[in-house]
Every structure is written in structure tokens, then in C-alpha cells.
């Protein structure tokens, strides 16, 4: 279990790339009311599905926007832009899966949640630009922002990531590394 105090999120890994032989990443996410609004992003090589366990799950998947209730399942195809948020006044609990499982998912969450525990996210829960591009260069097979366009990301991010690394930013920090326990 990892917590992000700045965003009001708690994440429990249920299945990882290692535990599933690369087949399935599964996690359970808890988001406090008013918690982080996940920015629009894509998964370039994974389908993602969500099952709402409790609360109101606000989402935008492609052009479709709505609020899902407990018991509903949503699927986001590979490469489709999507975002999510807690749309209610009670805690949101969702279960989600990515197929196939990538170790970069674990790196992404470990670093993002670790930065939050150190108070290094913006008030909106975003990662510093240079830190973000260093991380995204490492985990680009798992996640990419929906904007700017991919061609622009491909041109700018390597340059910005180099600058970020020169300033000491890393994609992964030993102090945030967690022994991943799955259930």
C-alpha cells in the first residue's frame, strides 16, 4: 500500500508485472472527496479497465464523459485519452487493470506517490516539469500525457529530460522504492 497525502490517494497493488509474468497489473485505488483529478493521459500499449467498488467515479474516456456508480465497469482501449476523478462527497474506491503488465507502472506510482509524501507536488497534485519529463522518459511505454501532441513530446521531452537529469532529477529514487506486495 502506498499513500499520496498531497492528492488524497491510496493505492494497493494486487498484481504486478513480476507476480503475473507480465500479463496483468491490478490495483485498488482509494480517493478522498475533493482528491486529485488525474490529468488526461494515454496508455500507448495497454488496455485499462475500471470497476467502481464504492463512490462516484467521474471519468472522461475519449469523447465520452460521465459518472459511474458502484458495480459499473468501464474499459479504455489502448491509446485513448482518459482522465478520472472522485465525483462524489464520499471516498471513491475503484479496482483497475492494465493488460499487459509493465514494470514501468510500478516505477511511475512509486515515484509519484513518493514525491507526494515528500511534499514535492504542486497544490493541484502535479509533478514539477523537469521531474515529470525525466519520469515520463522512463515510463513512456506505460503512460504519456494526452497533450502536447506526441510528435512535440518526442522532440522536446528528451531535451528537457537531459536538463532535468543534469539538475539531479531521477525517474526512480531508492528512498521511494517499495517492496511490492500483492494479494
Specify the residue positions occupied by each region the protein language model found.
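Short acidic-glycine-tyrosine-enriched beta hairpin
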Residues: 19-22, 49, 62-81
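Glycine- and acidic-residue-biased ligand/ion/polar-headgroup-sensing regions
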Residues: 45-57
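Residue-level recognition of well-ordered beta-strand positions that form the cores
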Residues: 28-30, 56-58, 95-97
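Short, charged/polar surface micro-motifs in flexible loops or helix N-caps
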Residues: 32-35, 56, 100-104
Amino acid at each position: 500500500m502506498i499513500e499520496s497525502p498531497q492528492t488524497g490517494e491510496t493505492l494497493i497493488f494486487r498484481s504486478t508485472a513480476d507476480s503475473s509474468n507480465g500479463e496483468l497489473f491490478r490495483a485498488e485505488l482509494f480517493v478522498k472527496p475533493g482528491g486529485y483529478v488525474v490529468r488526461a493521459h494515454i496508455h500507448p500499449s495497454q488496455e485499462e479497465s475500471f470497476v467502481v467498488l464504492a463512490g462516484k467515479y467521474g471519468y472522461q474516456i475519449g469523447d465520452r464523459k460521465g459518472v459511474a456508480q458502484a458495480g459499473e465497469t468501464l474499459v479504455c482501449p489502448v491509446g485513448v485519452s482518459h482522465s478520472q476523478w472522485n465525483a462524489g462527497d464520499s471516498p471513491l474506491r475503484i479496482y483497475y487493470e492494465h493488460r499487459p503488465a509493465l514494470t514501468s507502472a510500478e516505477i511511475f506510482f512509486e515515484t509519484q506517490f513518493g514525491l507526494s509524501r515528500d511534499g514535492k507536488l504542486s497544490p493541484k497534485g502535479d509533478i514539477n516539469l523537469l521531474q515529470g519529463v525525466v519520469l515520463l522518459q522512463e515510463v513512456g511505454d506505460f503512460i504519456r500525457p494526452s497533450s502536447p501532441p506526441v510528435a512535440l513530446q518526442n522532440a522536446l521531452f528528451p531535451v528537457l529530460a537531459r536538463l532535468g537529469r543534469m539538475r539531479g532529477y531521477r525517474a526512480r529514487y531508492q528512498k521511494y522504492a517499495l517492496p511490492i506486495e500483492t494479494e
